[in-house]
């Protein structure tokens, strides 16, 4: 028995509608890929320095916030464990995004509440202030560095989900090792400014200002607008290869890479290695070896010499 004409027409219309939806989806995908060069957002990757293959991929926005949290912590003299706790907390609370909303009046990276004395809305939305407040509370907890991460974080945050921080510990550990400089050449970003391809013109003065904002005035960067560069002196000694100033240099260098998209940074050089925006491989490949003397002109770890981190902005 043939189907009624009404049902036939309805089926035909449904098929046409479904085809139109598929075509629209394909067209949207193609447009996004064309506009972004195949990637919706600039990305960053941090890799383990232990050779275990562990890695964590995140966005340029998250990289900027993570670098700020780490810089504020080390500038306060907090150990790497404190930075790990802070990063895991921010990953859980906000996904490392400086959000203007949350549960009740919670705001910012750590979802701090003005009504509970964390500061004003404007203060809490400042990542440097928010990180400083978190570390100030963490430092008051006796033996926090020996506590399980989720316990230490919960004593600061007093969250309704006290066990939730633990799941972020592996990623936070990778980030902290890299951003504190202990794991050298372990972080890379593609360096594309959000919403476009390539590296747009940058301003060395903006880079200098951001460095001082995150690390404090002691970082002493020197901006050279004519050469589009910022140079940060890192005093080096024989012992620095095992930590100390050498670790500080990598902290500054990987901070710069984390801020590449936001500040339109094109190249970062330190300790005989150079990172260039546009590299999409892993960190080991992105930080290429340069001359034996390194871009600063001083041999790595040479006694009495002064190494430097050199940051070049896009033109």
State each model region's role.
Residues 176-178, 261, 268-315:
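Extracellularly exposed regions in secreted/surface proteins, prominently low-complexity, repeat-rich
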Residues 187-251:
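Flexible, glycine-rich surface segments
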Residues 144-206, 264, 268:
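A charged, amphipathic interaction segment
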Residues 1-71, 182-185:
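N-terminal export signals and maturation junctions of secreted/periplasmic proteins
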Residues 94-96, 116-164:
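Alpha-helical segment that forms one wall of the substrate-binding/catalytic cleft
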């Amino acid at each position: 028995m043939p189907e009624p004409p009404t049902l036939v027409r309805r089926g035909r219309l449904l098929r046409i509608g479904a085809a139109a939806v598929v075509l629209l989806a394909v067209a949207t995908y193609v447009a996004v890929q064309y506009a972004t060069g195949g990637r919706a957002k600039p990305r960053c990757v941090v890799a383990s320095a232990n050779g275990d293959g562990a890695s964590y991929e995140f966005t340029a926005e998250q990289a900027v916030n993570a670098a700020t949290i780490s810089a504020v912590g080390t500038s306060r003299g907090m150990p790497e464990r404190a930075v790990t706790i802070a990063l895991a907390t921010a990953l859980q609370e906000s996904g490392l995004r400086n959000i203007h909303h949350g549960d009740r009046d919670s705001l910012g990276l750590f979802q701090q509440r003005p009504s509970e004395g964390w500061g004003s809305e404007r203060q809490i939305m400042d990542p440097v202030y928010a990180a400083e407040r978190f570390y100030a509370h963490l430092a008051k907890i006796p033996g926090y560095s020996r506590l399980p991460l989720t316990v230490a974080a919960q004593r600061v945050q007093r969250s309704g989900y006290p066990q939730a921080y633990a799941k972020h510990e592996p990623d936070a550990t990778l980030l902290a090792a890299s951003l504190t400089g202990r794991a050298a050449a372990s972080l890379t970003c593609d360096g594309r400014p959000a919403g476009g391809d390539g590296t747009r013109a940058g301003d060395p003065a903006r880079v200098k200002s951001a460095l001082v904002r995150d690390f404090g005035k002691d970082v002493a960067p020197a901006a050279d607008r004519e050469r589009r560069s910022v140079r940060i002196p890192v005093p080096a000694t024989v012992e620095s290869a095992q930590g100390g100033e050498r670790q500080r240099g990598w902290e500054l260098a990987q901070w710069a890479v984390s801020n590449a998209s936001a500040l339109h940074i094109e190249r970062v050089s330190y300790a005989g290695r150079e990172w260039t925006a546009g590299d999409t491989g892993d960190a080991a490949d992105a930080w290429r070896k340069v001359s034996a003397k390194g871009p600063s002109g001083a041999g790595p770890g040479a006694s009495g010499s002064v190494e430097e981190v050199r940051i070049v902005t896009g033109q």
